[in-house]
Amino acid sequence: MQKTFDITWGFFPLVEFIVSSSNQIGSRYKTALDIGSGDGVHTEILRSAGLEVFQLDKYSDTAEYKEDFISHNFNHKFDVIFCSHVIEHQRNVGHFLDKIFDVMSDDGLLLISAPKHRAEVLINGHLNCFYSTYFMQQLIHAGFDLKNGKYLSCMGIENAAIVSKAKNFELSEREESGYIWTEKHQERSCIELVNQELHNLIAWFHNCTVLYPSDTQLQFDVHFPENYQSKAIDITAERHGFKITI
């Protein structure tokens, strides 16, 4: 049966993950945690793709965990952590990413997205700016592997990443400051870490196999693998004029 969902945020990492990892969902990736799940639409998309998904949202009546993510003590880990437009609300971004790292299975994936509005723009509840220059560094310092993972600069809409735990990360790094880039940081980065200016509003998909930049009006194309079997999921992002069946 065809299922239709409309979402505003998190469109890009969802499409890239579900299509590119289709053959591993249900085997390598079985369980997922949706942090800040809201009304649960992202959860339902992930469930329709074949994952067992748990919602965490202290403001939601449908969430399995109606608690604060930082304060809750989990008794197991998850293969996939999904976090769409939640990190910008955190007072302590590093602590938040540390907790995600700790509840994610050792060979799991983090799917995370954040808005990319200018730092000069004041938005209710947005305590942080996640232009790529900041977002990448936060993920790298928290021990996630951007070099071998996927980074998605989605035009003026959002930045996102699909990343695993970096093999060269040690928990003792949490005691370090962000004073200087180390060799380990360079090994985890998808760009050379040097003082530079990054263009924030372009379509750029590092290591992605489904989403590609294009010269079309949408600024991106979707390439399905040759033997891909559709999940019969229609996803629209009406606010941005996107629609896709995966």
Model region roles, listed by residue range:
Residues L122-L127:
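Short, solvent-exposed loop/turn segments at secondary-structure boundaries
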Residues P115-E120, L152-S153:
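Short "lid" loop at the C-terminus of a central beta-strand within the Rossmann-like core
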Residues Q90-R91, M104-D106:
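Helix-to-beta-strand junctions that scaffold the AdoMet/dcAdoMet cofactor pocket
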Residues F144-M155:
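Conserved S-adenosyl-L-methionine
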Residues D107-P115:
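Conserved beta-strand signature within the Rossmann-like core of class I S-adenosyl-L-methionine
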